[in-house]
Amino acid sequence: MKKALLTALLALALPAVAAEKELLNASYDIARELFARYNALYEKEHPDAPKIKQSHAGSSKQATAILQGLKADVVTFNQVTDVEILASKGKLLPENWRERLPHNSSPYYSTTAFLVRKGNPKHIENWGDLAKEGVSIVFPNPKTSGNGRYTYLGALGYAQDTFKTEAEQHAYLKDLLAHVAVFDTGGRGATTSFVERKIGDVLITFESEVNGIRQEYGAADYEVVVPKISILSEFPVAWLDKNTEAKGTTDAAKDYLQYLYSEPAQRLLAENYYRVRDEKVQAEYKERFPDVQLKTVEDIGGSWEQVMKEHFANGGLLDQLQKR
């Protein structure tokens, strides 16, 4: 009887033990393939590490899900404000979280690029061409997607360099938005609309995504256009102290993110067309990445907080420009 009871108790305990051996990485929409490859590399180098599970959606949708109870151990997002809200509103990590890892907790970065169909029939070379008559564009909704916000801000940065007055800049943005064929909630939805549903002449998304599409669907059918001036897109990462402390996974979560800065991980990132911090790896993959003048969010809008309030809040400039 005692033996049977002990066996039953051990059986009940096993799921709890297994749960402690898992890390949940909540990430942005188009990072599925990247983190499948990174997790395989990490687990190969760390055979005793917890099993890594993934959750993917638009960066802002992920932040909302976590605030509503998704017990992520780590976040690998594409916009700083989506981590900030987890600190300020959710109290899941300290306000100085960007100081805990190198490069403001952004182990890699990208920029916004264009994917056009074979032969570039609409002759797309820069941001101005996106608003030409007869051009139909696809990118994620800036309301729900960090990817989409970078596209909007990249266009604004171009407008600031090209047009003298704010009225002219806003007129360009309004014209650009009028050329959007579909606003998907996330980057992968936008890719599906462009590639599989054949909507639009130009897909605007991260440089890593446009090159990934050419690899997956065939380089002969698409061309990549990287504008001479674009926006610096940082990819912040963080462990969520409140969740990891409750689950006993803090050390594992830290190690998982710190390994992103290692040479093998940086090489994997570069292979997947992300721009990296490691100078040796940068030099190895230099031919993959065209020279671009990268403007920061701060260059364009002052700060993320200011940008979110002025452009993406309800009733902000984005909403105003979309009114017909």
Residues of each region from the PLM?
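Extracellular/periplasmic juxtamembrane helices and adjacent flexible linkers that interface
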Residues: 244-324
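A conserved helix-loop-strand patch within extracytoplasmic ligand-binding domains
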Residues: 87-161
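Positively charged n-region of N-terminal signal peptides that target proteins for export
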Residues: 1-4
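Early extracytoplasmic/lumenal segment of secretory-pathway proteins
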Residues: 18-89, 100-101, 206
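Alpha-to-beta junction loops
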Residues: 69-75, 134-136, 197-202
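Hydrophobic h-region of N-terminal signal peptides that target proteins for export
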Residues: 9-18
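A bilobed periplasmic-binding-protein/Venus flytrap-type ligand-binding module shared by bacterial periplasmic
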Residues: 111-120, 234-251, 268-272
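Ligand-binding pocket segment of bilobal, Venus flytrap-like solute-binding proteins
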Residues: 161-228
